[in-house]
Each structure stands twice: as C-alpha cells, then as structure tokens.
Amino acid sequence: MSTKSYTSRAETHASPVASKLLRLMDEKKTNLCASLDVRSTDELLKLVETLGPYICLLKTHVDILDDFSYEGTVVPLKALAEKYKFLIFEDRKFADIGNTVKLQYTSGVYRIAEWSDITNAHGVTGAGIVAGLKQGAQEVTKEPRGLLMLAELSSKGSLAHGEYTKGTVDIAKSDKDFVIGFIAQNDMGGREEGFDWLIMTPGVGLDDKGDALGQQYRTVDEVVSGGSDIIIVGRGLFAKGRDPKVEGERYRNAGWEAYQKRISAPH
C-alpha cells in the first residue's frame, strides 16, 4: 500500500483527475466519499449541501432518481461540486463490449461522460471496455476523466476475487492515465511497475456490521490500514435517525486520522 502523502502522490500521478482529487483531499483533509442513493433530486441536493464540506468525492447512481434531468439535476450538482470542492463519481458499473459502453457513457438520458469526473467498470468483457470508455470521454469533453475498475466487492458471496481480481488488475494496466484505480477491499499493488492506483472501498461503517441483503461492513481503521485511499460511506451518513452533518464530520475525522496513522507509521 502507499505510505506517501496524498500531495506527494498528486505531484507525480499520471492521471490529471487523480492528481486533482489527491490535492483536494489534502486541502480539505478528507478521504470520505459520500454514496447517496436517494430517489429525488431535491433530497440528493439537500444532502450534498450538508455533506459537501466533509467529502472529497460524491458517488451517485443517477438512474435511481425518479425525476432526473440534465438541467434540474446535473447543473446544480456541478455547482455544488464547485462550491464545496469535491469531484463526482457516477457509479455506473459498465459491463458491456467497448462500442456499447462508449454509447452508454456518452449518450441517452444521462450523458455521464459530460459531467462525471470518474466512473467505473467491470473487467468481465476484457480490455476493450477501457478503450471504449476512454474514446467516449475524448469525444464529448475536454475535461479530464478517470475510470475505476471493480476488482473486489463488499457484498457477501461476491464472485470478484482470485483469478477474476488478478485479470481485472491486468486490464487496468492497459491504460495508465485513464484507469486511476480500483473499487477494492485491499491494496492492489502495481507500484513496482510504476502504477499508483487509488483504492476506493465501499462497505465502510463505524456502527453497523451489515444488512439483510448481503452487505458486509468493515471499520474505517481496518480498510485504511489495509491500503484503502478513499472510504465510501452511504447509509452510515444519512440513514433514518442519523444527522448527516454530524456523521459527515465523524467519518471525515475517522478517515483522516486513519490516513495520518498510515503515513506516519514506521516502514
């Protein structure tokens, strides 16, 4: 895992998106990504307004929104990202052949490539998925874009492990500046070959151990000491009975303390 500071990694990173993200993480002293799965734009924007100061990244699933529109959802979301200095990650989990994902990424109702700094993909269809998404981004925007590969998942019984994970890491090596890292539970190596992948970890909870649908939670310390750079927290921030402001600050502090511990530990 990386024991360097976020800023020093930003200075040498091959990806403009990763560099930007690492810099703002240090500036805001946060490695918290808020995962906000809500059904209305109004609810989403209200939560972002509250959590914005505490996060480095916002993870969305815009296809859950009942009232999505480019003008009504994306435009105000981008304004909040600018105001609070965080990036946007649409958790689309692309999983088709190159040409299809290119169209899914750039077209349709959501036009993800136009507004989402980061997206992600499964490795199941091979390296063509990376090439297709990169081409899509280049065709519709001059803004830098980044891709995360899904190497490991936090759900019980996930098939993403062993040879599958290894194959996904090999696919990530096909494009150093577009593939910025992984959704994973552990460090994915690569440093000796010149890669500095960002590891983003879902299934992080300070209070809960899991849910009835197979989600399994791990503690902030556990994931950061294991190599995670960004903790992804969803219901822990805004579930019923929780105050998003209080929880945002709590998770931000816990994540930052764990990161400080990691970079200052004797190596």
Swiss-Prot record:
| Pathway recorded for this protein | Pyrimidine metabolism; UMP biosynthesis via de novo pathway; UMP from orotate: step 2/2
> What's the name of its gene?
URA3
Task: Keyword check for Lyase, yes or no.
Answer: yes
E.C. number? 4.1.1.23
Could you give a GO molecular-function term held by this entry? orotidine-5'-phosphate decarboxylase activity
Task: Could you list this entry's UniProt keywords, alphabetically sorted.
Answer: Decarboxylase, Lyase, Pyrimidine biosynthesis
Q: Which GO terms describe its biological process?
A: 'de novo' pyrimidine nucleobase biosynthetic process; 'de novo' UMP biosynthetic process
- Give a yes or no for keyword Lyase in this entry: yes
Natural source organism? Kluyveromyces lactis (strain ATCC 8585 / CBS 2359 / DSM 70799 / NBRC 1267 / NRRL Y-1140 / WM37) (Yeast)
Q: What is this protein called?
A: Orotidine 5'-phosphate decarboxylase
Q: Which residues bind substrate?
A: 37, 59-61, 91-100, 217, 235
